[in-house]
Amino acid sequence: MAFIGRDDDLKQLQECFTERRAQLVFVYGRRRVGKTETLIQLAKDKETLFFAAQNATKDEQLASFSRLMFEAGAPGKDYLSQYPSWERALTELTRLPEPSDGGRRLVIFDEFPYLVKSDPSLPSVLQNLWDHTLRHANLMIVICGSAMSFIEKELLGEKSPLYGRATGILKMLPMPYWDAAQFFPNYSSEDKALAYARCLFRSATPLLVL
């Protein structure tokens, strides 16, 4: 199925990617609003490290991320089975091979709140590394999640270690009618409106029916 809509969201993310300085961008919104697919579209023409976190332990998350890093060419795969800590793992982002096209690397952490759940110190670790290392790297890091109140309070709020570090914030809202209607080119105008209204009534998220 063709990717429909989200033009403004993609434009905002692409503009962040083309900025000269390193980027730390937060993308959030309710579940099934289209965050992951939008990020997949963003990543299509870029060298990307896409890590989809799961509801797992810290050790399991680190093992999965380590495998992804080693596959991307990070040093250490010959003598490490996995990174011992998130501090070490995130530091190694700066040692990944430079993109072959001469551009910057895109690093996406999808469902980041799962990582914080398994290791509550992670926001502090990321803040320290961003301040001293990562903000000077040729990277765009995207922190994505569905736990909206958690992201707004624990990651973006004034009491968060990451407060003031975001270079971009995208709160994704439900797909507007004119975009959603494109999924049903053969529907009458009335049927398109009914399908959209039915979905809003059920979940407040049009993309669920689409």
Feature-to-residue mapping (PLM):
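Phosphate-binding site recognition
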Residues: M1-L210
